[in-house]
Amino acid sequence: MRIILLGAPGAGKGTQAQFIMKKYGIVQISTGDMLRAAVKAGTKLGQQVQGIMAAGKLVTDDLVIALVKERIRQEDCKEGFLLDGFPRTIPQADAMAEADIKIDYVLELVVPDEFIVERISGRRVHMPSGRIYHLKFNPPKITDKDDMTGESLTLRKDDQETTVRERLLEYHQQTMALVDYYRQRAKRGDTKYFKLDGTRTVNEVSQQLSSILGES
């Protein structure tokens, strides 16, 4: 089972990726982790990546595709994999198709922007302990104070509304065309595309996934 999981930051991809991995026994392939692992392993491709990154340049699509091909040949990918963070663009998706990397399912978690903004910008964190609160869904007993220590809570920069909206804009600019690309491929029978309602509870989304992917 080879899966691409699409969704905006804050749509719940991480939670559902863990569910898929556990239920179906497949591994998650993150391009960031893959690049770091290749450099650490010192493979020929890894040495190329290290040189490019050391020069402050972006790793080319061709090189990332070569790394993906190398990664999916490994034993732990025998039952399948879940691609995280790749492809992001149509040229990357085309390069995957040209490299004969077949994808069984493209799953898109859809959540309205305002829902995501509320979900993320409402977070407050007690930095020393890592405890996370939410102004609406899990508020502290005293506003902006940690329940255990009474210390101040922090709104992280990544959780600020302006930052969230910038990330959402970038996501939509990159991904709208990619979603249409995979819808067209699904119509041709090259893959299967499904859109899921990410505003539902975690369990409800997981149930949607189970009905699509089948029981393990």
From Swiss-Prot:
Q: Which domain of life is it from?
A: Bacteria
For this protein, the record's CDD domains field holds: ADK
Q: Which GO terms describe its biological process?
A: AMP salvage
Record region (LID): 122-159
Instruction: Determine if Kinase is one of this entry's keywords.
Output: yes
PROSITE patterns cross-referenced by the UniProt entry? ADENYLATE_KINASE
Q: Where does AMP bind?
A: T31, R36, K57, L58, V59, G85, F86, P87, R88, Q92, R156, R167
The residues the record assigns to binding ATP are: G10, A11, G12, K13, G14, T15, R123, I132, Y133, R200
Keyword Cytoplasm assigned to the entry: answer is yes
Catalysed reaction(s)?
AMP + ATP = 2 ADP
**Location in or out of the cell:** Cytoplasm
Q: Which UniProt keywords apply?
A: ATP-binding, Cytoplasm, Kinase, Nucleotide biosynthesis, Nucleotide-binding, Transferase
Alphabetical list of Gene3D superfamilies matching this protein:
P-loop containing nucleotide triphosphate hydrolases
**Pathway(s) it belongs to:** Purine metabolism; AMP biosynthesis via salvage pathway; AMP from ADP: step 1/1
Using the UniProt annotation, give all residue ranges assigned to the region (NMP). Answer: 30-59
Q: Recorded GO terms, molecular function?
A: adenylate kinase activity; ATP binding
GO cellular component annotations of the record:
cytoplasm
Q: What is its EC number?
A: 2.7.4.3
Instruction: Give the matching InterPro entries.
Output: Adenyl_kin_sub, Adenylat/UMP-CMP_kin, Adenylat_kinase_CS, Adenylate_kinase_lid-dom, P-loop_NTPase
Q: What is its main location?
A: cytoplasm
Q: What is known of its domains?
A: Consists of three domains, a large central CORE domain and two small peripheral domains, NMPbind and LID, which undergo movements during catalysis. The LID domain closes over the site of phosphoryl transfer upon ATP binding. Assembling and dissambling the active center during each catalytic cycle provides an effective means to prevent ATP hydrolysis.
Similarity comment: Belongs to the adenylate kinase family.
Provide the assembly information.
Monomer.
Q: What does this protein do?
A: Catalyzes the reversible transfer of the terminal phosphate group between ATP and AMP. Plays an important role in cellular energy homeostasis and in adenine nucleotide metabolism.
The identity of this protein, by name, is Adenylate kinase
Whose protein is this, by species?
A: Hamiltonella defensa subsp. Acyrthosiphon pisum (strain 5AT)
